[in-house]
């Protein structure tokens, strides 16, 4: 088999290493690749004790992608069990249905333990899940021991080692339960995180919302400004209200244009000046001085006009 594959491929190296590690069967699981296909494995797992699957021995396929271990495998059960559909890719956090929860550090052994740990759990409508009654599952568990795989030739009666009652067996059961719990918890966390990120990504706002917020802040910062200053500032903030399109439906060019328009709005001199409070007394003082100067100039012009008129009359009489 080694001569048929590129030994420099990370997937080939990883699968050959795992095949060597799983070569010897245990009392709970066993898995090996087919003789003519390194990327398809057949596995056998024992049903978890103290459950509806106690006493059952279940067989299935693991189809691995060329990108393994960066992408998860697909898992297909071949033995009727009452928990997973036969001949269909099942939906687990470690399977190809959930690449977002898969970790490259997980292995085929991880998948086998997860299958054992997930068997007593509820399907909850997942793809490939079944919810048979406990009686039906126990009957299928007994029937599973007579199954023989045509693809690899494995017989369920002798493919696994006899079940032990020692600490190794209980440790494997506990490890499977703990692994299933951790994977399930990780899937829930990732699912909630994905919901949050999608809601943030799909959230859109319009410039109207921005206009509603800016005057409030501006009025709080310039409570002592005159009414005319507030009106001019409010007028400088007024912009046409056009809703901003969602990021997911805009082209890169449209997103860049949107970002540039937002930057121009935020760096506008009117906006910058609007956030800088002015001294009301300084404005009134300057206006008063200007009024006085204009009044004095007007009075000087009037007096000069009167003076010139009187001087002309005096010269005329002489």
From Swiss-Prot:
Give the GO terms filed under biological process for this record. ERAD pathway; negative regulation of retrograde protein transport, ER to cytosol; protein N-linked glycosylation via asparagine; protein polyubiquitination; regulation of macrophage cytokine production; regulation of tumor necrosis factor production; spermatid development
Enzyme class per UniProt: transferase
**Pathway involvement of the protein, from the record:** Protein modification; protein ubiquitination
Species lineage:
Eukaryota, Metazoa, Chordata, Craniata, Vertebrata
Q: Which gene encodes it?
A: UBE2J1
Under the heading SUPFAM superfamilies, the entry gives: UBC-like
Purpose of the protein: Catalyzes the covalent attachment of ubiquitin to other proteins. Functions in the selective degradation of misfolded membrane proteins from the endoplasmic reticulum (ERAD) and is essential for cells to recover from ER stress. Plays a role in MAPKAPK2-dependent translational control of TNF-alpha synthesis. Also acts as a platform for perinuclear positioning of the endosomal system by mediating ubiquitination of SQSTM1 through interaction with the E3 ubiquitin-protein ligase RNF26. Plays a role in male fecundity through the interaction with the E3 ubiquitin-protein ligase RNF133.
- The residue spans the entry assigns to the Lumenal side of the membrane are as follows 304-318
Locate the region Disordered: 229-283
From the record, give the cysteines joined by S-S bonds: none
Coiled-coil boundaries:
none
Its recorded name reads Ubiquitin-conjugating enzyme E2 J1
